[in-house]
Amino acid sequence: MSSSEAVTREYTINLHKRLYGTTFKDRAPKAVKQVKLFAQKIMGTKDVRIDNKLNKFLWSQGIKNVPHRVRVTLSRKRNEDENATEKLYTVASLVIVKSFKGLQTKKVADN
C-alpha cells in the first residue's frame, strides 16, 4: 500500500501515556498536538485537520482533565486546491465507543 492513496482507518490513541507528567495548564492543548502528531506519523501527511467534535471531546472535561483514551477515524484525502503545497491531507474525527476493551485498528469502507 502506498502512502499516496486515499484511505480511512480507525485507531485508539492512548493520550494518558502521551500526557503523563505534563503541567495541568498544558494538557488539553498538548492532547490536540499529540493527536495531530499521531496522525502525521501514521498517515504520512503533514497537513492534519482536527474535526470540531474531536476538539470539543478533548476539551470536554476542562484544560487539565483530558480523557485517557480517544477513538479516532483518520481519513487521508486528496487536496482539491490546485496551488496547495501538500497533495494529501488527513482529517481526524471522533468515534464514540462505550468501552475501549478489545478494540483494534480497522480499515473503514470508503464512501
From Swiss-Prot:
InterPro entries, per database record: Ribosomal_eL31, Ribosomal_eL31_CS, Ribosomal_eL31_dom_sf
GO cellular component, one term: cytosolic large ribosomal subunit
Pfam families the record matches: Ribosomal_L31e
Keyword annotations of the record: Ribonucleoprotein, Ribosomal protein
GO biological processes: cytoplasmic translation; translation
Cleaved signal peptide residues: none
SUPFAM superfamilies per record: Ribosomal protein L31e
SMART domains documented for this protein: Ribosomal_L31e
An example molecular function term from Gene Ontology annotations: structural constituent of ribosome
Superkingdom, taxonomy of origin: Eukaryota
Family: Belongs to the eukaryotic ribosomal protein eL31 family.
PANTHER family: 60S RIBOSOMAL PROTEIN L31
Name of the protein: Large ribosomal subunit protein eL31
Organism per entry: Dictyostelium discoideum (Social amoeba)
Lineage: Eukaryota, Amoebozoa, Evosea, Eumycetozoa, Dictyostelia
